[in-house]
Amino acid sequence: WRGEEGGIAAAKSGHDAIMSPTSHCYFDYGLDATDLKEVYHYEPIPAELTEEESKHILGGECNMWSERAPQELVDSKVFPRILAMSEVLWSSSEKDYDNFYSRVQKHYPKLDALGVNYGFESVPITSTVVFNNDSFYVSLFKGSPDMRLEYNLNNGTWQDYTTPFGAHSTTTLKARGFKNAKPYGEFEQELIRHIATGKKVNYIIPYNSHYQGTGDYNLTDGLLGSIENFRDGYYQGFSGTDMEVIIDLGQNTTFSNIETTFFQYYLSWI
């Protein structure tokens, strides 16, 4: 469990082991951590083992800790990722994800017939946002190649997404996906414009390399982190140090208050 070190040590000492690292095998984790492609590329026999030692790796195990997911979400977390784990454990180490992906699509009609409430193969919709020349520039990305995306700004008209677009002021971006003519994921993001948006941040104390967020402009990029998931890529962290920064507004500027947000989660030492 957790990592591969215990299994490697067991095999090297002549004991049998079943591998189940968190990096690929914990299905209670979200798709942002472990999606279908990540599971498919898992190799249960560590490269550090000799041919003789590798005989002690009996297989792998995937985990679904239901206390981390309401009962109604269990199906969507297990399927379709369990198809990838099955493929990994009964196939050779050679990988062809495109071929596997095409075969996964053939399983969905049967899962529908069985009443399985399966989930997504990867995070359905993601974005990159860059603030430049006094505007936000937004690119949307679909998690599956056979998806179609629509978006709207500030609850306006839905339109097909084909190319990146701009937004000049504080904006609520919504997007939705479709696959095989069925809804396939929703996305919402606030683009927040203020006097510090896009301004340079000078870090007197550097942020931790494990919690980089979006980089040197994380604090002024106009994007807020999720209130539910500190792993969403928008949080920047400092470990064992204070936080001290200088934000250069570029000119003398009058302001009346400063707002910031923090994430607290004791179970992850945050």
Residue ranges of model-derived segments:
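Short beta-strand/loop motifs in extracellular/secreted proteins, especially
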Residues: P145-L149, M243, S256
